[in-house]
Amino acid sequence: MAIYMVDRSLPGITMDQLAAAQSAAIEMGKKLTAEGKSVRYIRSTFVPSESHCMCLFEASTPELVKELNDKANIPYTRVVQAADLTP
């Protein structure tokens, strides 16, 4: 499994809406995994001054990450493979 970063531009989003999007990503990941499509939300970093959000997912392909976000109705600008450098 690889790590993928999802870039998002979210102008005007509230913290409540951001929390709801996070919950939707987590739940859709569980649903897809139960269907045999292993994809997992890891975490997000939000930059309020730029309305920019970067989210990390673990999946075998970027298409699974896109599918999760599309089905959860969470907009994104790109999905790229990344490295999660957790200490």
Regions found by a protein language model. Give the residues of each.
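A short linear hydrophobic-aromatic micro-motif
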Residues: S38-S44, R78
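Short S/T/G/P-rich N-terminal loop/turn motif that feeds into the first structured element of a domain
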Residues: M1-T33, V47, P62-D70, D84-P87
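Short capping/connector residues at structural and topological boundaries
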Residues: M15-L18, H52, V79
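Amphipathic, hydrophobic secondary-structure cores in small proteins
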Residues: F46-M54
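Conserved short beta-strand edge segments in small beta-sheet-based binding/regulatory domains
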Residues: I74-L85
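Short hydrophobic/aromatic beta-strand micro-patches
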Residues: L56-E58
